[in-house]
């Protein structure tokens, strides 16, 4: 099963995505949610994921900056 991390500063968005997207149909499982980029970056250091779905506009570090840091800090 593919491991999915959802990142959004609005709780209702991450909860809504879990309901609206048929993750199980595509052999995916939401393993964690994060409400900011820093929390997501800390999570992936010890917990590998296959897919990150993120909001672009978040306070502090935005989603694009977060993805760039993930790419630079992870081997694959």
Task: Give short role names for the model-derived ranges.
Residues 4, 47-53:
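Active-site beta3 strand of CheY-like receiver
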Residues 6, 33:
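Conserved SAM-binding loop
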Residues 8, 55:
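Active-site residues of response regulator receiver
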Residues 11-32:
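Two-component/phosphorelay signaling modules centered on CheY-like receiver
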Residues 36-39, 62-65:
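Acidic catalytic/metal-coordinating carboxylates
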Residues 45-47, 69-76:
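Conserved phosphotransfer cores of two-component systems
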Residues 58:
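Receiver (REC) domain active-site loop signature in two-component systems and cognate sites
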């Amino acid at each position: 099963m593919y491991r999915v991390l959802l990142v959004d500063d609005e709780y209702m968005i991450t909860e809504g995505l879990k309901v609206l997207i048929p993750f199980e149909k595509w052999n995916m499982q939401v393993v964690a949610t994060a409400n900011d980029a820093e929390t997501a970056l800390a999570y992936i250091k010890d917990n590998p994921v296959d897919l990150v779905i993120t909001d672009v506009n978040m306070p502090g570090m935005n989603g694009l900056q977060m993805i760039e840091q993930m790419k630079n800090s992870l081997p694959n």
